[in-house]
Regions:
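Amphipathic alpha-helical segments within well-ordered protein domains
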Residues: 11, 26-30, 44, 48, ...
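Structural signal for hydrophobic packing residues in well-ordered secondary-structure cores
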Residues: 14, 18, 29, 33, ...
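C-terminal binding/interaction regions
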Residues: 2-3, 82-129
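Glycine/serine-rich anion-binding loops at beta->alpha junctions
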Residues: 47-70
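Polybasic, low-complexity association/targeting segments
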Residues: 1-14
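Phosphate-handling active-site elements
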Residues: 31-42, 69-83
């Protein structure tokens, strides 16, 4: 499966309510992760509505950083994390969940399924997929 297919599938999982944003990104890469699907869902469960219930980082971005850490065996993960953050911000307009959802402004920057899609695409770009 190529990164565009992974991104489309992850966005669909989020759009249909099958996963939260972090879980959808983790699930999109489950074939590359040495972790059982049930465990992946548990790892991502705390990031529904981003970290801290919309107060901090988008769950999709968190999921992408978790995947990066595993697939690179932790080598270069801080650099990759920074690149992911920059790439995601360029695509979505922010990295904080409440800003992306437009909680304070009433003007969402990027809907959740698109944040998920963009996180997967950003990860693919940073990892060279």
């Amino acid at each position: 499966m190529n990164v565009e297919e992974r991104a489309a599938q992850a966005a669909a999982w989020k759009a249909t309510g099958q996963c939260n944003c972090a879980q959808a990104v983790l699930k999109a890469f489950e074939d590359k992760l040495p972790v059982e699907a049930d465990t992946l869902m548990k790892l991502g469960a705390g990031y529904a509505a981003g970290m801290g219930c919309m107060e901090s980082t988008c769950g999709a971005l968190i999921g992408a950083v978790m995947v990066a850490g595993v697939v690179t065996d932790g080598r270069g993960t801080p650099r990759i994390s920074k690149e992911l953050l920059q790439n995601f911000q360029e695509k979505c307009g922010a990295t904080i969940c409440k800003d992306l959802k437009g909680v304070e402004t009433g003007a969402p920057l990027c809907p959740c399924p698109e944040c998920v899609r963009n996180a997967v695409l950003a990860l693919g770009e940073v990892l060279g997929e």
